[in-house]
Amino acid sequence: MNYTTQMDAAKKGIVTKEMEIVAKKENMNVKDLMELVSKGKVAIPANKNHKSLDPEGIGQGLRTKINVNLGISKDCYNIDMELEKVQKAIDMKAEAIMDLSCFGKTEEFRKRLIDMSPAIIGTVPIYDAVGFYDKELKDITSEEFLKVAEKHVENGADFLTIHVGMNRKTASTFKKNPRRMNIVSRGGSLLYAWMELNNKENPFYERFDELLDICEKYDVTLSLGDACRPGCIEDSTDASQIEELIALGELTKRAWDRNVQVIIEGPGHMTLDEIETNMKIEKKLCHGAPFYVLGPIVTDIAPGYDHITSAIGGAIAATHGADFLCYVTPAEHLRLPNLDDMKEGIIATKIAAHAADLAKGVKGARDWDNAMAKARRDLDWERMFELSIDEEKARRYREESKAKSKDSCTMCGKMCAVRNMNRVTEGKDLNMLRDDD
C-alpha cells in the first residue's frame, strides 16, 4: 500500500520503518505509536531526501527531545566553525539541529549539515530569502518565498519553521495591544515588516495550501512558528500570543487534513506561575499537537546565565506537556555561541528534559537515576563517571581535588555518610582517625 507521509501511513494502518525505529527507541508498542502519529499527537520528522537520518519521535508519551540552534550570520560567517558545532551537537546526542543561517548563500552549509547529520534537521526559509534572491525584503514576492521553502525541503530539511499565524488578524491584535518588547521572533518580525511594507497578507498564510503541497510531497513536518512569543516576562500570555495560537490551531487541522505533520512552537519569556497554564492552553487550542518551546526563560535579568533560566522553565514546561525543548546557551541575548557555550546549553537542556521525563513517568527514565544511585552507594567512582551527563567534567572535578581515602571525596572525607553507612551495615569499624583504610 502506498503512502505520502508518516501521518498518511499511520491513518492507513501502515507501519513505516521510521515508526519501527522510534518505537524501539521509546520502548513502546509500534501499533500504539502509529495510533498517536495518526492523530497528530506524535510527529516523526523524516524528509524523504534526508538519507543519513536516524529518526526520532516528538510528542505524547515519548522522551522529551532537545534541539540545538546554529548557523552562519553576517558577523560570523565561518562555515567550518558551524560544522564543528554540528559535530558537537551530534556527539552530545541532540535529537534535532536547526540551521538558523541568515546571511549570504546558505545552501552549501545546509547541504553539508544534512548530509552529515543523523539528527532531525529544521530550517527557517524566510531567513534565507534575502540572501537567496539578493533582494530587499519588501521586493520579494509571495511566490518567491514559497520557492525558498521548496529549496530547503529539496535539500532534505525534516521540518520547516514557518510563522504562518502572523496573519493580518494577528497583526491587528498586536497593534491594538502594545508590548514592552514588540515582536522578538526574527522570522515573525520579518514577515510583519513585509506585510506592513507591502500592505499585503502573510504570503505563507495566503498560500498555505501550496505550502502543504510542498510538505506533503517530501514528507516534511511543519513547525508552526510563534511570531508573537513573549520577549520579556511583561509580554507573556497576552492578546497577541493567544490570538496567534488560535490561528495555529486552525492551521494545524488544515495540515492534518492533508496528512502533513505539525509541531507548534511556543514561548518564550514568562514567569514560573504561567508556564503550566500556557502548556495546557496550547494542547487545548492546537488539538494535542506536539509543543516545541524556547525555554521558557523565567526571568529577564540573567544575561550570561540564560541556559539556567531556560532550563528551569523548560523542566516545568515539559513536565506539564511540552514535548520538545530548544536549547539556550549562556551566550543568549549577547552573541553567537561558541563550542563551550554549546556544551553548557546542551547539558542544561538535557537535564531539564530528563527531569521532566522523570516527573511524567516516561518509561525507562528512572533507570538512569537508579543506576547512578547504585554506583554512589557502592562508591564506584568509575561507574559514576560513566553515568554522568557530563563525564569529562565529573572526572576533572574528582581529579582536581583528590581525597586521601578512595571511598570518599574532599567534601566529607571519612565522615562521608555513604562510606560510614556501608561500613556499619557490613559490621566494619568506621576507622575515622587512622590514615589507613
UniProtKB/Swiss-Prot annotation:
Positions contributing to Zn(2+) binding: H269, H333
Source domain of life: Bacteria
Sequence positions that bind [4Fe-4S] cluster: C409, C412, C416
Free-text cofactor note: Binds 1 [4Fe-4S] cluster per subunit. The cluster is coordinated with 3 cysteines and an exchangeable S-adenosyl-L-methionine.
BP GO annotations: thiamine biosynthetic process; thiamine diphosphate biosynthetic process
GO molecular function: 4 iron, 4 sulfur cluster binding; carbon-carbon lyase activity; zinc ion binding
Chain residues that bind substrate: N69, M98, Y127, H163, S185, R186, G187, D226, A227, C228, R229, E265, Y292
Gene Ontology cellular component terms for the protein in this record: cytosol
Keywords per UniProt: 4Fe-4S, Iron, Iron-sulfur, Lyase, Metal-binding, S-adenosyl-L-methionine, Thiamine biosynthesis, Zinc
InterPro entries linked: ThiC (IPR037509), ThiC/Bza_core_dom (IPR038521), ThiC/BzaA/B (IPR002817)
Matching Pfam families: ThiC_Rad_SAM
Top enzyme category: lyase
This protein's pathway: Cofactor biosynthesis; thiamine diphosphate biosynthesis
Family: Belongs to the ThiC family.
Function as written in the Swiss-Prot or TrEMBL entry: Catalyzes the synthesis of the hydroxymethylpyrimidine phosphate (HMP-P) moiety of thiamine from aminoimidazole ribotide (AIR) in a radical S-adenosyl-L-methionine (SAM)-dependent reaction.
HAMAP family: ThiC
Protein name from the UniProt record: Phosphomethylpyrimidine synthase
